[in-house]
Amino acid sequence: MGVSQLPTDNYWLSLAYYDLQTAEAMLQSKRYLYVGFRCHQTIEKALKAIYAQNNNEVPPKIHNLARLLKLVELEDDIPHDLFNVIHELNPLNVASRYPDEDLAI
């Protein structure tokens, strides 16, 4: 993929915004498991937007929010409450796809 074909940070941010709107719609319809998953996706794509902007390259194909925070060097700069929310959402990426992985949800 040539540099002109790289997804931009705007691309990732528009996907993140779409996921946020989807999470809000699911919250209104009480689809709570999927709200968590979409919130995870929102944060993941927002972090990938930061990565794309900072590195001028396609973000890695990972879904671990804690790892993405480290890659964009924000883990020490975000408010403690947001840091905790990100760590609470992190397992929902797997749990919503494979419900038997964590029956406590």
Regions found by a protein language model. Give the residues of each.
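Terminal alpha-helical segments
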Residues: 1-105
